[in-house]
């Protein structure tokens, strides 16, 4: 690992020399490329330089211990050595984490899809709870959310909702939420007090720029229809809702949230690009990302990543055996503790692969 960091430092010095050359300064594109590479290396290099400085200080302190005669002074020096060794060990771990491969999508905004699974109306109410939880979480992170399509009713039941979460790092945090979520609780309409089990699926797709994926328009059927929303003169007079069908894959995307046909079309294509990119990436690297269909599973009660048990006020994440309490607090969007634990577990597994 230290050899890799030495190479990083060498490249960092080369970039600093190159970026000051007149022929480079006049090439704006090259300057941006080099500046980005330097920024990517900077944290690693700063850590490595600090590590070397502590290593040199530790060596000098050990030499001092060998020549020191006074026992009280020796005790002080031993304490200093222990402190320096701990600093080096901590820094070594940080450097190892910094060198782990990064998900190229981590900084991206996302498209999130929530669908009610098994459980009838109770599943729809649970899907609505999840939607509220994620929008509240986005608010706490100062991210913006925007609905693309929603299929629900006035009773608070959501069959399906597709929405954007726009903010740097949204994918790095919310990617851990994809999969089947299960709820166990007594419905308000259940007179006997019997606990019902329901599910909802969550898909998290990184947003894809138009330049990142090429869609052949001959492969897309565009249908325009009247919105099934609240109604009004706009719905009566103008068909603004859009349905896209990608013929080769069978993917279907609908958007009817906006009153503008153009805005609905743009949003629908954004979702289609994200879904197509997910399918493409799943073929290229099955270990890093699954296909969208595998991601959300079949939403039956046996498949699950997480269970929300209301009678026991307990959340269980089955992937890592995590247990948390205070469901009302969690459902208000306070997810960082759970997500931090999942991220740490992922880093630990990656470190095992490095060993």
UniProtKB/Swiss-Prot annotation:
Descriptive protein name: Peptide chain release factor 1
Transferase listed as a keyword: no
Gene3D superfamilies: 3.30.160.20, 3.30.70.1660, 6.10.140.1950
Primary location group: cytoplasm
Task performed by this protein: Peptide chain release factor 1 directs the termination of translation in response to the peptide chain termination codons UAG and UAA.
Annotated compartments: Cytoplasm
Chain positions with N5-methylglutamine modification: 233
């Amino acid at each position: 690992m230290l050899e890799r960091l030495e190479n990083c430092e060498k490249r960092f010095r080369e970039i600093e020399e190159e970026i000051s050359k007149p022929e480079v300064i006049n090439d704006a594109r090259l300057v941006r490329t080099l500046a980005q590479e330097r920024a990517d290396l900077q944290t690693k290099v700063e850590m490595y330089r600090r590590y070397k400085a502590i290593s040199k200080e530790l060596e000098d302190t050990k030499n001092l211990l060998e020549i020191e005669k006074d026992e009280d002074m020796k005790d002080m020096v031993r304490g200093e050595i222990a402190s320096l060794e701990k600093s080096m060990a901590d820094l070594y771990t940080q450097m190892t984490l910094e060198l782990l491969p990064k998900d190229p999508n981590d900084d991206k905004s996302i498209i999130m899809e929530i669908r009610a699974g098994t459980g009838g109306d109770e599943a729809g109410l649970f899907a609505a709870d999840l939607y509220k939880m994620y929008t509240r979480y986005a608010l706490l992170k100062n991210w913006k959310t925007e609905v693309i399509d929603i299929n629900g009713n006035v009773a608070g039941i959501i069959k399906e909702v597709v929405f954007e979460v726009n903010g740097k790092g949204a994918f790095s945090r919310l990617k851990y939420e994809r999969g089947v979520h299960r709820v166990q609780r007594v419905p308000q309409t259940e007179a006997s007090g019997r606990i019902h089990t329901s599910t909802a699926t969550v898909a998290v797709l990184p947003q894809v720029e138009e330049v990142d994926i090429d869609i052949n328009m001959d492969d897309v059927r565009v249908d325009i229809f009247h919105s099934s929303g609240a109604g009004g003169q706009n719905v009566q007079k103008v068909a603004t809702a859009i349905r896209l069908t990608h013929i080769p894959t069978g993917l279907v995307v609908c958007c009817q949230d906006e009153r503008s046909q153009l805005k609905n079309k743009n949003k629908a294509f954004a979702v289609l690009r994200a879904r197509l990119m997910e399918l493409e990436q799943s073929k290229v690297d099955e270990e890093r990302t699954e296909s969208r269909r595998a991601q959300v599973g079949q939403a039956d009660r046996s498949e699950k990543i997480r269970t929300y048990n209301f009678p026991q006020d307990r959340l269980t994440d089955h992937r890592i055996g995590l247990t948390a309490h205070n469901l009302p607090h969690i459902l208000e969007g306070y997810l960082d503790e759970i997500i931090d634990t999942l991220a740490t577990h992922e880093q630990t597994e990656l470190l095992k692969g490095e060993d």
